[in-house]
Amino acid sequence: VEKTGCKNVCMSGGYFLNCVSNTFVQKHLPKDVNTFIEPICGDDGISIGLAKLNYYSKILSRRKFPLKDIYFGKKQKINIKGNKVSPKDVAKLLSDGNVVGIFQSRSESGPRALGNRSLLYDPRDPYGRDKINKLKGRENYRPLAATVLQEHAHKWFDMCGLEESPYMLYTLDVLSDKVPAVNHVDNTCRVQTLKKNFNKHYYNLIKEF
């Protein structure tokens, strides 16, 4: 940025799955610099990049492909017997201390669970992290991530100049003591901010909760 004067910076590669370093970069860049991190920035994203490169180099088209979400995985169906549940029903289950699994539509591309293949739990439970880590067979110090509605993100987290964090690529300082399950030892949390047009069903669930 200093050498080129460029105000638009795009970052990619497996290194940029490191949320701590991403936040460091965000905090130390000038405020007028726009940043974008490719959310599928590991090896699995190379095929997408090569396909786009080939498209633009061979077809010479100016057509753009805006990134609306990263639910590019296979759409699967499971035949199970049960009753349909509303966002209100699921919110009640969470408030009662239950772990809820979400399995809907296409799976997420990349390593982050963003509401289509996710485990949910009440972040207000001070023992929530231990409970989920035990359930997943992980070390007890492993942090949990949080999803927050876009319009309320600044109330709960220090967004350090970011307008949004839809792909869970930053660790942000927690501003409230009401969500201990997602508050790591350094007072940060890996955050997904959520808009309705990104994932309508997941948005409605979080809003109801």
Predicted regions and their residues:
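Short glycine-rich phosphate-binding loop at a beta-alpha junction
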Residues: 5-14, 101
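Phosphate/ATP-binding catalytic cores across multiple sugar-kinase/actin-like superfamilies
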Residues: 1-9, 202-209
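Flexible beta->alpha loop and helix N-cap segments adjacent to enzyme active/binding sites
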Residues: 17-18, 22-209
